[in-house]
Design a protein with these regions (language model features):
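Short alpha-helical interface patches
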Residues: 58-61, 69-80, 228, 239-248
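N-terminal [4Fe-4S]-dependent radical SAM core
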Residues: 1-68, 78-86
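Conserved AdoMet/S-adenosylmethionine-binding subsite of the radical SAM
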Residues: 73-219, 224
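Auxiliary Fe-S-binding modules of radical SAM enzymes
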Residues: 1-20, 185-255
Length: 255
């Protein structure tokens, strides 16, 4: 099997934070959003990019390479025994996998045909018909909640309403959902923002967990290595920040 091709910038093996069990996470390159705090800025462009080495001495690397569905599946299926023993599987991430619809659909379909559990990590910003087409192929939706509607476009680069409409749609169709919430101190962690997360977790059928993802500055170094002139900076989350977030969201089973 060869199948269609797309630009992949990483394949992470033995991942344990992107769905249940031991997983392989396939990162597709290209995203329509521009989150200020993005920790993988090399995922934004839809084309391969040159990135300086971390030590500044080694040759630069090219981030992203064209791979077929068959090539990706050859890597994914190597660890099927681990998936079967741990309840794991394949997670498609990005970038934004819904912006790579044909490749994502073909890859998920291939995994399902081999009995591999599937998850997709997504912002939910995509035409409804794409999401509807993927519903039979996705066992778990890892759905980003980045900011409340009032400040969403300012921080992320797109309106929140289509994302919230799509979330309500998959919930109405019986999807299993994990809400993933990147929180940046002083940026998107206001009382209003935390109340928005709590409401979604309580009112959206199918939400099995809320994952809080505290900001970390990984993206700062990557932006520098990509040669970008300016980039976002924010403080690390303190333990007090994290405790406040957990208390406000009131999710006993969050990570």
């Amino acid at each position: 099997m060869k199948g269609g091709s797309d630009i992949v910038f990483d394949i992470e093996k033995f991942a344990v934070h992107d769905g249940p069990g031991i997983r392989t996470v396939v990162f597709l390159k290209g995203c329509p959003l521009r989150c200020l705090w993005c920790h993988n800025p090399e995922s934004q462009s839809f084309e391969p990019e040159r990135m300086a080495s971390a030590d500044g001495k080694s040759p630069p690397e090219i981030v992203g390479r064209s791979m077929t569905v068959g090539e990706v599946m050859a890597s994914v299926r190597k660890d099927k025994a681990f998936y079967d023993n741990s309840g794991g599987g394949l997670t498609v991430s990005g970038g934004e996998p819904l912006a790579h619809f044909d490749f994502t659909r073909e890859l998920l379909s291939a995994a399902k045909a081999e009995g591999i559990h599937t998850a997709i990590e997504t912002s939910g910003y995509a035409p409804r018909e794409r999401i509807e087409a993927l519903l039979p192929l996705v066992d778990l939706w890892l759905w980003d909640v980045k900011a409340p509607p009032a400040i969403h476009e300012k921080l992320v680069g797109c309106p929140a309403e289509p994302i919230l409409d799509n979330l309500a749609f998959i919930a109405s169709r019986g999807a299993s959902i994990v809400l993933r919430c990147p929180l940046v101190p002083g940026v998107n962690d206001s009382d209003e923002a935390l109340a928005h997360i709590r409401r979604l977790s309580e009112e959206t059928p199918g939400v099995v967990r809320v994952d809080i993802e505290p900001y970390h500055p990984m993206g700062e170094d990557k932006n520098r290595r990509l040669g970008r002139a300016d980039w976002f900076r924010a403080p690390f989350a303190t333990e007090a920040d994290k405790a406040r977030w957990r208390a406000a969201i009131h999710q006993a089973n969050q990570r």
